[in-house]
């Protein structure tokens, strides 16, 4: 079952990925109570996009879970056992490879880092293996879809499948992930405030000065005003399920109808799904499979598994320390797939804004000339981030 629907109301408000930094798979592990675990999250790929590794510490109690970034660590990835690549911290706990870096099939990678306190860690060596291309993708309309946790009502979905040719005479391990571009018509919400911008000229075609939400104490403290987008805008969502497969009983066969996504339908607008098919090492596959079995197959990602899923990173001075997460290397086959939604035959859809906020937009009344915030009602800028873009999605 897709977790897209379960966390949708939080995606924009928390500024998430939710979770993935470019080429990094980030899966928050279920933790037992009263734990303090180091979490390593990262996949080196052969894609040209920015690649990062995340280091954090998860502290849990019976009623809370806190994720604290590990800052100012010295992070290096050793390529082929001899060439060190130094990463730089670009956000708290997020370490980025140098510009232009991308992995190569056949090369090996090992993560090494030292915390600010001088504790040294290293991963096992991961070798990047090739991955076959996705031959085609297609979707079906599922009227029953998935169910929300709030009211258990079914939300229709586009269920997406892929075909691919598995290479013969070898064992292959796969992981699928995706990112979804949904058109967004509303770009800002102001609480006890008004969205303000001014044209610097020429009006309509020149630069603008964006002040954003400016507080207005004449409004109630819980007053919300919503502002439409000034131009085209897309919200970006990422997969959170762990979807893995081993060809142990299907070596060399054409794989038909592998389900890779169930995308909830909140609007009839077209959307773009970028499908990624990744190759995994045997050890990486075992880790992700165990993680999926302990979380997805026992309820939700919030459920506590029997024990933390320990990965392939170890403390050099204390091998008994449990380090959660997995550092791996994977070749990636990418296929952009357009969800036309022409096969959506039934249902009433209230739009993406309603799905995220559980309410309809509240539009500010037009302003008069006496308002310090300007005249009329402004439209809002689509501010690019990890979960939003004003650029036409690749493959649109």
Where are these regions (language model features)?
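C-terminal motif of bacterial Sec signal peptides marking the signal peptidase cleavage site
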Residues: 19-22
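Bacterial N-terminal signal peptides that target proteins for export
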Residues: 2-12
